């Protein structure tokens, strides 16, 4: 059967991303640092890239490529990330894509704190009570993410030249991407927005595969079944 053929197919597995190192150890497969994976993919797709901005569900990072690699990443707080956007969308009784649609027709931007969901809620609730439109609030939420990323991660280091936008939020939310472009005053030739930007770390990790580790898919599935979530968490702490 087709399933049997897939299970027996030989693959070169590689893991990257948050929490990936622990899983890679238990599965006995190679691990690639996310910054290495992203750098590899960008060198292949857009070697002219000077800076990459990547937003994930709970992390945000800026990677500078000029004069060596310099990665800036947020700490334990998920402010200004995908989960923050989801929290704010719930306040407006919509989802992330709903925010994106609203933001397309904004007229005003309000100051909102993005360093923490709690602070942001205290900024947004009075605006809702005062009758601010969902269009303006949505655009303001995206602008808050931009401000948090630039001020919290760049810390004064200029973001200039050719800039790549990576990760799920920047891939699916066109208005969030536009808020960055607008704030950074980027020209059309300076914008790097790959078609599969939300999968860039995975693409880059695959490009860093090891020829020494080749196993059938069914072996990986068996190893996954043998690893418990509780066991993984115990090894991360």
Predicted regions and their residues:
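Short, small-residue-biased leader/transition segments that mark boundaries at the very start
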Residues: 1-7, 234-237
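Conserved phosphate-binding catalytic cores of ATP/NTP-utilizing and phosphoryl-transfer enzymes
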Residues: 19-66, 70, 150, 154-155, ...
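Glycine-rich phosphate-binding loop plus the immediately following alpha-helix
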Residues: 67-108, 116, 207-211
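Glycine-rich phosphate-binding/hydrolytic loop that grips phosphoryl groups
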Residues: 85-86, 193-228
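Adenine-nucleotide phosphate-binding core of ATP-dependent small-molecule kinases
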Residues: 120-151
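Phosphate/pyrophosphate-binding loops at sites that engage ATP/ADP/AMP, CoA/4′-phosphopantetheine
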Residues: 4, 8-11, 149-161
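Conserved phosphate-binding/catalytic loops in two-lobed NTP-binding clefts
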Residues: 31-35, 181-203
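Glycine-rich phosphate-binding loops at beta-strand->alpha-helix junctions
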Residues: 18-19, 155-183, 194-198
């Amino acid at each position: 059967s087709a399933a049997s053929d897939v299970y027996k197919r030989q693959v070169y597995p590689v893991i990257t991303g948050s929490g990936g190192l622990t899983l890679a150890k238990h599965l006995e497969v190679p691990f690639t640092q996310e910054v290495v994976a992203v750098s590899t993919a960008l060198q292949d797709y857009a070697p002219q890239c000077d800076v990459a901005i990547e937003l994930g569900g709970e992390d945000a990072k800026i990677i500078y490529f000029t004069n060596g690699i310099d990665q800036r990443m947020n700490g334990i707080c998920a402010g200004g990330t995908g989960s923050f956007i989801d929290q704010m969308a719930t306040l407006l009784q919509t989802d992330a894509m709903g925010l994106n649609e609203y933001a397309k027709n904004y007229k005003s931007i309000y100051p909102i704190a993005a360093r923490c969901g709690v602070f942001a809620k205290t900024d947004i609730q009075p605006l809702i009570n005062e009758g601010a439109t969902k269009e303006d609030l949505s655009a303001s939420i995206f602008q808050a993410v931009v401000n948090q990323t630039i001020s919290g991660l760049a810390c004064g280091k200029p973001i200039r030249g050719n800039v790549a936008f990576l990760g799920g939020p920047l891939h699916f939310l066109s208005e969030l991407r536009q808020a960055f472009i607008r704030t950074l005053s980027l020209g059309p030739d300076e914008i790097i927005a790959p078609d599969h930007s939300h999968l860039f770390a995975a693409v880059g990790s695959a490009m860093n595969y090891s020829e020494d580790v080749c196993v059938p898919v069914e072996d990986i599935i068996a190893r996954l079944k043998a690893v418990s979530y509780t066991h993984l968490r115990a090894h991360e702490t």
